[in-house]
């Protein structure tokens, strides 16, 4: 088993491991009974799996993704997680955050940002801030 020494990779792997445990509970009793912070883990892991880990070999920008873009995408995903974690700590329901559409936008970023314009990923931080401020 290969492990990543980078803290950002470790945080993502930790979230995915936590999601695996939570999915056992979800299979038995459903996700409605989970506390909001655990619902957040499940939602952010969907973004990680679909928007980051899953690869489309037939898409021109997803066939090969430069390391800089991969790292920036991880930054964006973890920024979304931290901002949403703050909202949940304030008592905001995950349903409001998901309804804002920001999870879908972040999931699609690998297709929306060309590999030769990685700087466009910086705009996702602003979009996350805007979505969070609307929910807050």
Question: Residues of each region from the PLM?
Answer:
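Conserved catalytic/coupling modules of large nucleotide/cofactor-utilizing molecular machines
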Residues: 1-136
């Amino acid at each position: 088993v290969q492990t990543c020494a980078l803290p950002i990779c470790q945080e993502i792997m930790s979230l995915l491991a936590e999601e695996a445990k939570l999915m056992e509970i979800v299979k038995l009793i459903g996700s409605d009974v989970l506390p909001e912070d655990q619902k957040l883990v499940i939602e952010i892991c969907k973004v990680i799996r679909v928007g980051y880990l899953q690869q489309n070999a037939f898409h021109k920008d997803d066939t090969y993704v430069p390391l800089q873009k991969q790292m920036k995408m991880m930054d964006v995903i973890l920024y979304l997680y931290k901002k949403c974690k703050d909202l949940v700590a304030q008592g905001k329901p995950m349903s409001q955050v998901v309804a804002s559409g920001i999870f879908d936008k972040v999931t699609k970023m690998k297709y929306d940002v060309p590999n030769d314009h990685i700087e466009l990923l910086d705009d996702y931080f602003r979009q996350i801030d805007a979505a969070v401020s609307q929910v807050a």
